[in-house]
Amino acid sequence: MQSSVFAFKITSTSLEYFKQRSFGIIFDVFNSMNSCENELVKDYVCNIGNEEFYESLKYHNDLIYSSILTKNHDLLKDFFIWKYSVYSSRNIDVDCFLQEYRFWKESVLNHLYPSHANEINIIYDYLISNHENFKINASKRKNIFVNSEYQDLFGELLFCLLNSGKNEFYSLVRRNLNKFDNDIFLFTKELIKPLMYKIGQMWQLNEISVAKEYFATSLIDEIINDLIKENFFEDSNNPLVLTSTVGNELHNLGIKIVGKFIESHGFCVKNLSSKISNKELINSIYVLKPKLVVLSVTLPSNVATLQEIVKELKSDLNLFSGKIVIGGQGLFSTEKIVSIEDADFCSRNLEELESFLKNLR
């Protein structure tokens, strides 16, 4: 792919104008696509419906903004490969995206000064020139790693999750926890994490419905939460840690598990609601003054929001003087880590987080 040699040359001024005028830009692309006579475009919009289409444009815009802000090419590349894979699996001809990119370019030109628009539109020239590469890479199924020792159990859990009820899945998990010395964190690492990836991939490839994907992830969330609560108890006398997802995240099981893991290492953990606004999150941190804040992003489109929150928290030591740890799948979509300025530590897994916690105490 050309991403290794592609360099962002977009000024902060151009990026700020792009952010400020994003609503108008998105709205124009939405209208242009809906009135387009291109048969591929008409088929695409008709198949997914206006609501999903508009949400996809907003996600696209947030992802572009996050990629530029963090100067991370892989965020951009990986998202579009994923997008092509999703819609190809739904029998949509992804050549329709070429026309969409042209509409984005036109809309950016209409809403920004020419010099700023030309900088932003470098991105769309890149997308157009890499269109065929995205198609090729989207056709390759990504292997999900499962420890060979647990392959059979993984298959059994997956089948039970998709074909049985809550009680059967719960019993299966219970019966096999002893293989992990009843360590729910190890069980989650070896089986639940790849299981969640597999469910997501099956939805992506149109092998299961949205409803089935939602049921499966909700069931995993409920059962793992119950098992964790059975084994850990909060001590309010311990140093305070605040945990939270950032942005419009749909799943928060990961950050809940991280919170209980931190709690098991002698901290009092408060997990803030996934529906909390950025302002409410920051104000809560200022009021509670925790020793540590742990922030997670699953969706790459929320990386920019994470960067902005971390930057604000670190801007005044009188308001917050604690440490900030960041993590989540959205930061590790490739072998490269998405860099977030001013964060004290970026954790890939519980082992890395454990090392950080030992030094913190």
Predicted region positions:
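Cofactor-cradling patches in redox/metallo enzymes
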Residues: 263, 271, 276-336
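Peripheral docking tails and interdomain loops at the edges
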Residues: 327-361
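Long amphipathic N-terminal alpha/beta scaffold segment
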Residues: 175-252
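Core of compact, soluble alpha-helical bundle domains
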Residues: 1-82, 88-102, 109-178
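Cytosolic, long alpha-helical scaffolding segments
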Residues: 90, 252-256
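Alpha-helical scaffolding segments of alpha/beta enzyme cores, especially the outer helices
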Residues: 215, 222, 257, 283, ...
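Residue-level detector of anion-binding/catalytic polar loops
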Residues: 268, 291, 344
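Short helix-loop-beta junction
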Residues: 256-270
